[in-house]
């Protein structure tokens, strides 16, 4: 990943060659641009991957680039596919399962510093 900064105090994150992590089997994460208030993360999930039910104080906006997932937010479950988006309010329990290989873009506010 290459980060370029100019005098105007903004940065461009080039994702070609980005450093990725595998926080758990079946999940690959790449982190894009971030600031004190925002963080963009790309997640790729293998079919059959199921994340643990969890919550965090960050508001999370999710855009599904490709694939098919089942999402549970609080007690409501729904399915999402490529082109769909949704918001998970901060401190709300949620969980995702990949019904097929899937790729999502997540935007968190404030920044999830543990992803950096």
Predicted regions and their residues:
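A short, N-terminal "cap"/entry segment at the start of jelly-roll beta-barrel domains
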Residues: 1-37
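Anionic, Ser/Thr-rich low-complexity intrinsically disordered regions
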Residues: 21, 41, 73, 105-106, ...
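Conserved short histidine dyad/triad with adjacent acidic residue
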Residues: 41-55
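Short beta-strand segments in beta-sandwich/barrel cores
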Residues: 50-51, 67-72, 86
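Glycine- and acidic-residue-biased ligand/ion/polar-headgroup-sensing regions
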Residues: 58-69, 74
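A cytosolic small-molecule/anion-sensing beta-strand core signal
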Residues: 65-66, 81-82, 100
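Short acidic-glycine-tyrosine-enriched beta hairpin
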Residues: 75-90
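Ligand-binding loop in jelly-roll beta-barrel domains
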Residues: 90-114
């Amino acid at each position: 990943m290459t980060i370029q900064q100019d005098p105007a105090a903004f940065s461009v994150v080039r994702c070609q060659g980005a450093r990725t992590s595998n926080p758990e089997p079946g999940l690959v994460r790449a982190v894009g641009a971030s600031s004190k208030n925002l963080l963009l993360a790309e997640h790729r999930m293998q079919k059959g991957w199921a994340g643990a039910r969890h919550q965090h104080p960050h508001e999370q906006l999710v855009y599904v680039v490709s694939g098919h997932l089942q999402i549970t937010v609080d007690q409501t479950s729904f399915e999402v596919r490529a082109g769909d988006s949704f918001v998970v309010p901060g401190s709300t329990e949620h969980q995702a399962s990949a019904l097929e290989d899937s790729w999502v873009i997540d935007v968190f506010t404030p920044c999830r510093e543990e992803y950096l």
